[in-house]
Amino acid sequence: MSAHDLKLEEIVNAETLRRKLNELADTADESYTSLPMRKVVLQTLKDALASGRANAEDMLMKDGGGTLCAKRLCYLMDTLIDILFEFATTRTYPTRNPSKAENMALVAVGGYGRGGLAQGSDIDLLFLLPYKQTPWGEQVVEYTLYMLWDMGLKVGHSTRNIDECIRLAREDMTIRTALLDARFLTGDKDLFRTLEIRFEEEIVKGTEPEFIQAKLAERDARHRKAGETRYLVEPNVKEGKGGQRDLHTLFWITKYFYRVKTKEELVKLGVLSRAELKLFNKAEDFLWAVRCHMHFATLKAEERLSFDIQPEIAQRLGYTAHPGQNYVERFMKHYFLVAKDVGDLTRIICAALEEQQAKHVPGFNRIFLTFSRRKRKLSDDGAFISENHRINIARPDIFRQDPVNMIRLFHLADRHGLEFHPEAMQSLTRSLKLINADLRENPEANRLFLEILTSPRNPELILRRMNESGVLGKFIPDFGKIVAMMQFNMYHHYTVDEHLLRCIAVLSEIEHGELKTEHPLSNHLITTIKRDRNLLYVTLLLHDIAKGRPEDHSIAGARIARRLCPRFGLTPSETETVEWLVREHLTMSMVAQSRDLNDRKTIIDFADTVQTMERLKLLLILTVCDIKAVGPGIWNGWKGQLLRTLFYETELVLTGGFSELSRAARDKQAREALAERLSDWPKEERDAYLALPYTNYFLTVSLDDQVRHAHFIRDADQQGRALVTMAKPHAFEAVTEITVLAPDHPRLLSVITGACAAAGGNIVDAQIFTTSDGRALDTILISREFDTDDDERRRAERVGKVIEDVLSGKAHLPDMLAKRTKPKKAARAFKVEPRVEINNTLSNKFTVIEVEGLDRPGLLSELTGLISDLSLDIASAHITTFGEKVIDSFYVTDLVGHKISNATRQGNIKRKLLALLGAENGARTNGRSPQAAA
């Protein structure tokens, strides 16, 4: 960013200000240290400060650049301090022949050192000396500080020589962090460079894990103080979760570990993609803009975005009201989205550090020792003691004497609810070589490990400690292979090992009843499988353990489970169950999200795979944990509804409750049931309506929805409207249903999905029906955006209006798509190999076309349009998004209702779809589908 971009000359003209002070000094009769001269100098600097701040605020209001404003204010302060220090050393307290001891460097540290300030930010200064302070130096420091304080600035300061800086940085993490941000301002630059070199060599080198763990622990403590959630309605912009300090922490740890000076260097190192760097800069800019506006608006260092100032800040940032949402709500929504982005960046960077084994030295809460120094034995042999609520080793050789103690340490910590003493962990780390084949096969060690894994307390916490220490990967080498393994895509938020630990945490929460509202079925089922609960914990630990191998990780993982389970002490029957669960851990998610659950063949095929109710229960809970632990925002109510539907439908088959009535008999029953619900209609009108839908409609749509559709169509007919839409929010499922009644034509679904995309609707499912009088009744499900049904209904009605306008010709779809949809820029960093499969075995009635490719705006509209152009009728569409990747399934027939069985025609369909997806030469068309969870 150049000075021209910053327009620094509009903030303060350094030469003009310096010349003005020198002219005042040259013409003054008083001593430079006199009170009158001091007042003149002070007023000149205060005027420059006020003018510069006013200019910075004006520029912020015009260009909106938060980072620009922070840099401008920093430049203003740099200029004033430089000129003041020069005046102090050359005019107020000049030295004719300064000795080496009187050299001094003025250094910006802390937040000021990072090069960005809000109006009320603290100014942290280090007066750096070569040796001890001199009388002359004391005068300069005192003059400079008092002038800055009298200018109304909050100045934090220290006066130290280099040896003192190094010693204190070694002892105090806060001082170390402040020096990490050190930036030369004025004075002796060689002195500052010496500090930089010694800090790098004597402090940074070799202490990366210690620093990173301390910063992350500090962040966690700060979150607990400010509020765990980033969605606090009155967030602290500086200290809250997802706020500025989180961004600072990210840069601190990467700067410390990778020895970089700028965020841009992280791209070259592969830590951040260019899209992620842009996201980082965008979040930083927004948070700076909010914080700078808050300081300007309140005339103080206000960091809490409270209710009373939210309206003014929203106005300053230029937000305006939209239908159903006022300008403050739009601003706060933007704030929360940025806070979420900061959380995403935290995961990205922490995962990259884990991948580089930056955290191989475990860190734990270092609690100040209490007055009590009592120790008590924790084991019969006296190997472990409890010391101030931390488990420690009683002797330095206990791991060498009995390597099982390396597992027993964690077992006892879990049983007694203890943290870990650093001494114990250091000894453990030095003893990792003792974990060998003999220990891995030791029955007692495996018994203890299984009890840790299946603990009724908080197994994730202890397993995380085992992982951080290196014990888990050594004890289970297959787990060690996936520690810090990154999956380079936009779907998975965590390393594989982190994902597995989070899965176990979710299961523990379900078992403790903490998620009964969000996951009612899992909450109920967990109480019915007490005998098999251990199998779920083992499965969750192992289900992704084969990631990163050339073969399907589910199959390879099942093979690993078959080998490990007997070692853990599981019976042959239990081992068989875990092996099956690992092999099929993606199946339920895949079927629920990408298959038509109203198609009987889907349910029967899935029941054939599951075979027993016990397996069905275990697989449902496993799937919930797996999806929920992928990352924030991945789980939603719609996925929960799909899984519950699949569970209940399969339960009927497995328990013998599934109807074996013929299709015709079920159609007859459904029509009679609807006729009964419409008994208040005139018979002639009722009979005419019952003749409209085809059999497939009655066999797949619930009776309540059939009644709702009947009144919907009746009202449209009475009003003489050929084209009409209806919206219905589903809060628990987190989707909103939009029903469209329109004259049928081949590209209707393409137009509807395109209109949804243009209106900002994210489609997750679509059901298409035609009536005997040539109309289409299409039901589209879009992701929910608002908390309240009223807000969501208004939003859905706006989407419906766009659909009506496009279908009626009032709006031109291509123009709307061009205006309203933007590519996901982050997705450009990824490649998804296009895939098309055509399958005639998944449904008795329909051909299933499954496509996979890189997501882009309007893709669903393009796909459905092409399928229609290929003379195919779409009965249903099932849309699944995994970050940058989409997997869409379409249930189709030809125009006379038959499956697509001709090989030549299938080949043509594949080629056309692959071309649309961007494949070269009609590339890959077969292969196992990459599926939903983890």
Swiss-Prot record:
Activation/inhibition comment: Uridylyltransferase (UTase) activity is inhibited by glutamine, while glutamine activates uridylyl-removing (UR) activity.
The cofactor named in the record is:
Mg(2+)
Q: Where is this region: Uridylyltransferase?
A: 1-379
* Source organism superkingdom: Bacteria
The HD domain sits at 496-613
EC number(s) from the headed UniProt entry: 2.7.7.59, 3.1.4.-
Chain's gene name: glnD
KW Nucleotidyltransferase (keyword) present: yes
Q: What family does this chain come from, according to its entry?
A: Belongs to the GlnD family.
Q: What's this protein's name? A: Bifunctional uridylyltransferase/uridylyl-removing enzyme
